[in-house]
A protein has these predicted regions:
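A late C-terminal transmembrane helix in Major Facilitator Superfamily
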Residues: 26, 213-248
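Extracytoplasmic gate region of multi-pass secondary transporters
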Residues: 94-146, 151-153
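C-terminal transmembrane helical hairpin of 12-TM major facilitator-type secondary transporters
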Residues: 106, 137-143, 157-209
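A membrane-interface helix-boundary motif in multi-pass transporters
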Residues: 35-51, 243-261
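Helix-loop-helix hairpin linking two adjacent transmembrane segments in secondary transporters
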Residues: 18-69
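Cytoplasmic helix-loop-helix junction between adjacent transmembrane helices
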Residues: 1-20, 215
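Flexible cytoplasmic inter-helical loops of multi-pass small-molecule transporters
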Residues: 65-88, 280-284
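Helix-to-loop junctions at the C-terminal end of transmembrane segments
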Residues: 147-160, 245-246
Length: 290
């Protein structure tokens, strides 16, 4: 939100870079936390991290707050500006529909990701992979970072609506492979890679898709709604999957997750359609002589 409010013309690309860097947070801080906890109590570890936030993050945030923002971000009245290069807004008549479909897409993706990631190892064990499931599941993190890196290098001209469809399609493809290929280790490894790729892209489009479809005005509020929809379904998805795995078969539980992933694909595909309906047709020249 801060990147967009600062008025940078390449906000979508900046969000991609920031997401890529943030992907290394667990890689750096999980081992660091373990090392600190070997020497300090858990309260002292939290104190160290709180001090880092106060001494490092807070000054940066205060500095960003003092930077001038464009009139659209400050609420000043001005002439409507032309959309930036990273914006392809839908028409006013279709905005409400696009907003609801986008919330549905992020809610479905959040449900699938939260359910699978929390139960990754138990799920793979239940499918007959055994202790190898722990090793295979480690492919998720590198795949997630790889998707962000690939998108940063080669996805600059790809519309974020298409990227959202690709992300949810990767989730659905991974679940399909898991449902049909288990307990084959190679099939499950490909599932983990596909799931990591989809998760990495979802984390990017969570910030860039509302910007492209709706523009900068009201961006913060819209991102908040999208995040709320995703967090809401993410909160109860692991519990619901555990209940389904206990009361139903693992296969039926995966089928439900696959259906939810396909709902996400459909939701973002509808937004692509709405966006194309809002794109003005390019007029053709009359070939007849004047």
């Amino acid at each position: 939100v801060a990147i967009v409010q600062l008025g940078n013309t390449g906000a979508a690309r900046s969000i991609t870079h920031l997401t890529l860097i943030a992907g290394f947070a667990s890689t750096v801080f999980w081992p660091l936390t373990t090392a600190l906890h070997a020497e300090l109590s858990w309260r002292e570890v939290y104190f160290v991290f709180a001090t880092l936030n106060l001494c490092l993050c807070l000054p940066i945030h205060l500095w960003l707050r003092r930077r001038p923002r464009p009139a659209a971000s400050t609420g000043a009245v001005s002439e409507p500006a032309a959309p930036a290069s990273d914006e392809r807004p839908v028409g006013e008549a279709r905005r409400s529909m696009a907003f609801l479909w986008m919330m549905g897409g992020f809610a479905a993706a959040g449900f699938v990701l939260s359910a699978v990631l929390l139960h990754m190892v138990p799920l793979l064990t239940a499918l007959g992979l055994g202790t190898a499931g722990v090793l295979v599941s480690t492919l998720f993190g590198p795949s997630q970072v790889a998707s962000r890196l690939i998108n940063m290098m080669f996805g600059g001209r790809l519309p974020q609506t298409i990227l959202a469809v690709i992300a949810t399609t990767l989730l659905a493809a991974g679940l399909t492979l898991l449902l049909t290929g288990a307990p084959n280790v190679a099939a499950i490894a490909i599932f983990v890679v596909l799931f990591g790729l989809g998760s990495g892209l979802i984390s990017i489009v969570g910030g860039t898709l509302p910007l492209e479809v709706f523009g900068r005005v009201g961006y913060g509020a819209r991102v908040g709604w999208m995040s709320a929809a995703r967090q809401f379904t993410s909160a109860f998805a692991p519990f619901l999957l555990a209940v389904m795995m206990a009361g139903l078969s693992v296969g039926l539980s995966l089928a439900v997750l696959l259906a939810m992933a396909l709902v996400g694909v459909l939701a973002f595909a509808v937004i692509v359609w709405l966006q194309r309906l809002s794109t003005p047709a390019v007029p053709t020249k009359d070939p007849s002589p004047a």
